[in-house]
Each structure stands twice: as structure tokens, then as C-alpha cells.
Regions:
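Flexible, low-complexity linker and terminal segments
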Residues: 64-208
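Thiamine diphosphate
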Residues: 1-82
Length: 209
């Protein structure tokens, strides 16, 4: 079973109560929370960074950088959500939402539905249960952090080693245009961070941004 919730950054605030709780509960299937941020306030009453909210809620975050990745990352978000029993936040921004690009389609793949399993300790967030789930969520996040170091969506593009840039999302496109000679670590999973991969990349460049 797969489900998706879509909102802007300000709507993510309204959804905070169930979001923080479902982070502890986990999901018996796949759950992706699509949140559209608006850097520059082009059509919003304020600016917010969903990555920070997701970090506080202990939720993993995927951030595509173009139209093709927007499609591929959605599929991956559901797959990772099912694998790690975690809701995944899928962050988009104004520039990504207005972008155009070549997107390759593929045949639809059917996904097996999972039956509802009654589990009060896992699904009812009373204090006694929540304390136990806190331990489990830290364990799952640690497993995901380790996996982040080898995920293909976190990739290194080595060029000149004088300058290295760590980036994600639409800013990746800006970096490639402004500094085509720089080495780049492009993050597709921005929370949790792939610490080992970052350390390895940092050790190979003279100046890191």
C-alpha cells in the first residue's frame, strides 16, 4: 500500500502534529510527503526550509534537481519508505516546479498491497509506546545514514581538485553553470547526510564549499 500527501511549506506546519507522530510510528507500506518550498517568496507569505523541519521530526528527505530526477526520486522515495519503514519527505522548490526537461517513461510496475496489521505498541503514540519507538526510530535512521554513503543518488563528480562544492536540488544546476571546473558532491538524500562520503570528498579537494 502506498500513499502520498502534498502541501507547501506553510501547510507542513499545519500537518506537524500527525507528521511528528507518524515519524515515530513508521508505515506498513510506503508514505511520501511532498513539500514545496518557495525560496524568494514568489507566491508565499514567508520562507521556510522544509529540510530543517524534517530533521527535527527525524524524517529522511529526498531532493531532486531536475525534471528527470523528480520522476525517478518519487519512485525511489516509495521504495525506501517501504524498505526502512519510514515516511519520506520529498522536497521540491519553486524553480524545480517550473522547470522543463526530458523525462523517460517506463512500464507501470504493480506493487503488492500489504494488509493492515494491528499493532498498538507501534501505532498508538501514548508516552509508554512512544519511548520505545524513539529507540527504534534512532536505529532506523542510523541504518539509513549508513546506506546513504552508497546510494547512487549521492554521487561525486571529480574535476579540478582546487575547489569542491557540496550541493543538492536546483542549486546543483547553478553550480554546474557557474563553476564547471569544480568537483561536486551532489546529494539526492539530504537527510540523513552521508557523512563518510562527505569526509572522503572533503579530503580530495583544497577548498570546500
Amino acid at each position: 500500500t502506498r500513499a502520498m500527501a502534498c502541501m507547501k511549506h506553510v501547510g507542513f506546519n499545519v500537518a506537524a502534529d500527525p507528521t511528528y507522530s507518524v515519524s515515530y510510528m513508521g508505515v506498513n507500506g510506503g508514505l511520501v510527503i511532498v513539500v514545496a518550498d518557495d525560496p524568494g517568496l514568489y507566491s508565499s507569505q514567508n520562507e521556510q526550509d522544509t529540510r530543517m523541519v524534517a530533521r527535527a521530526a527525524k524524517l529522511p528527505v529526498l531532493e531532486p534537481s531536475d525534471s528527470a530526477e523528480a520522476k525517478e526520486f518519487m519512485k525511489l522515495a516509495f521504495e525506501l519508505s517501504e524498505k526502512f519503514d519510514r515516511p519520506f519527505v520529498y522536497r521540491t522548490t519553486t524553480r524545480l516546479a517550473h522547470s522543463q526537461g526530458v523525462v523517460e517513461l517506463e512500464e507501470r510496475t504493480d506493487v503488492e498491497d500489504k494488509a493492515y496489521v494491528k499493532d498498538i505498541r507501534k501505532n498508538v503514540m501514548m508516552p509508554g509506546n512512544a519511548k520505545l519507538r524513539h529507540v527504534e526510530i534512532e536505529k532506523r535512521n542510523q541504518e539509513l545514514a549508513e546506506a546513504a554513503n552508497t546510494l547512487p543518488i549521492n554521487r561525486v563528480e571529480m574535476c579540478d581538485t582546487k575547489i569542491g562544492v557540496i550541493t543538492s536540488g536546483i542549486p546543483y544546476q547553478y553550480v554546474k553553470e557557474a563553476l564547471p571546473e569544480a568537483s561536486v558532491l551532489k546529494l539526492g538524500l539530504v537527510n540523513p547526510l552521508p557523512k563518510k562520503l562527505i569526509e572522503e570528498f572533503a579530503s580530495k579537494v583544497d577548498t570546500l564549499y
